[in-house]
From Swiss-Prot:
Signal sequence region: 1-41
Record's bilayer topology term: Lipid-anchor; GPI-anchor
Domain of life: Eukaryota
Cysteine-cysteine disulfides: 59-71, 85-159, 102-157, 185-209, 223-302, 243-300
Cellular component, GO, one term: cell surface
Protein name: Sporozoite surface protein P36p
Domain 6-Cys: 42-178, 181-326
Subcellular location: Cell surface; Cell membrane
Glycosites: 109, 138, 229, 279, 291
Function of the protein: Involved in sporozoite infection of hepatocytes and replication therein.
Record-linked Pfam families: s48_45
Propeptide, chain numbering: 456-478
Amino acid sequence: MYVLVLIHMCYHFTMKRKKLFVYFIFLSFIINFNFNININFVCSNVIQDVISIGNVDICVVNVNSDEAQECILNNEFGKLLLFVCNMNDAFSTTAKTHPENCPSRAFVNQSNPTENSPEVDTYSIYPNLFGTNENRLNDTYSLYSTPYSNMDIDFSCLCYGDKQDKVKHIMRINIKKTRKKIKGCDFGDNIPSKRDLTNSLSLNERSSCIIHAYSNDVLGINCFKKEINNSYNNNLELNPSNCFHDVYFGADLILNSKNVIPNSRVIPDPSSDVKLSRNHSFSSYLILPNNLTENIKISCTCKRDEFVGTMIIYTKNINSLMFDNNNNNNDEEQIFQNKYMKKKEYKKDEGNEYDKKMNTDDNYINNEEHHNNNQYNNYENKINNVNYNYDDISKYINEHYKNYDHEKNSKNSYKTNTNIHDQYDTYHYNNKYDLHSDRTRIRTRTFWQNLFGLSSSKYILFNNFLILFIFLIYIYST
């Protein structure tokens, strides 16, 4: 059919250009349509059902099947994603995978991968995938993933039986792009595209990170620099070692988080579910319950050599929303930094002068801490003794709504005190979308500029159209 169409086109080569263009479009459509049909026919794998049990999503392929089966699991934070290569002992079948060290290596964005498809190191592409730490997958493959990703991406591996090695089954996880980051502290000094937590710090100095947490919040901590074989990761410590399963309550008391915050949940779950690699053993996530009733202070720390980064979490129940004040945050952090910096100024060999100054500074710091403790106690008493009624709450909401509505309608309402870089990943944003950028915004290109590759400069645009106009006159005059 294609040959006849081409002969017909050659025979009428002298016809008007419009008809020639129509033939070309028609032929391209026919070829593309048949090509898509062939691709869909080749990729017609049998999609397996997903079984959900509690917090586990399970998908099973039968390695003894004569038809190629495909398991697809969509990323959902808090879910354990479990792939199973089902074997039949009666046939003495052994399950195999490709790549052999899946999930450390996998195929990325391959619709129908084969053994010859290019494979990549999973961690270098997407560090937020918590997988098994096995060199070889026997019959199961379990993983967690964080909800943050700066790209749409899918990872896949092949699963097959040694008695049926010509039929390759596919295990695939789909991860959707989202800009929203997790409330937490990243002490790994990571670039924005590899950071899924809102606050970025470095373990090149002593630092603290204070988080106010509420019901249903997801909190995270990370100590690891997400680069393979980076010297930053030498001598790292996460304390307590299984944070957030255990947390510091007070200065040095370690308690289980389920006892301190009932109905909370830690991701990853205990190592019996997922065997963590070293890359992921310095990260943890805490899911707070939807009925948080306690106002408490807990913490975990990251340590690198002599530098310590402390994550301090203040949990707040629903009553605390009426009195939440970010200024308390700054006071507590400032006291911490003042105490550290003042002690750092003195040397141990300065004798009596050193002791005199140190005592003076310690008294000053203790007075500050005493004042802060009194302020915190008054704050808690205010929360515990308050008796809310419907009118008070309605008045509070109405006042804050009016303030919000006034800001929303004001000329400068887009300017806020919150740093947008602490909430979203702007690593791939263009400068024209950045309201706080000092650079001149890029003009939007027109359809014709994109079509012909023309410059956005008005002078070059005029010259190009002039040349095009002269060329058209020459064509139609011949």
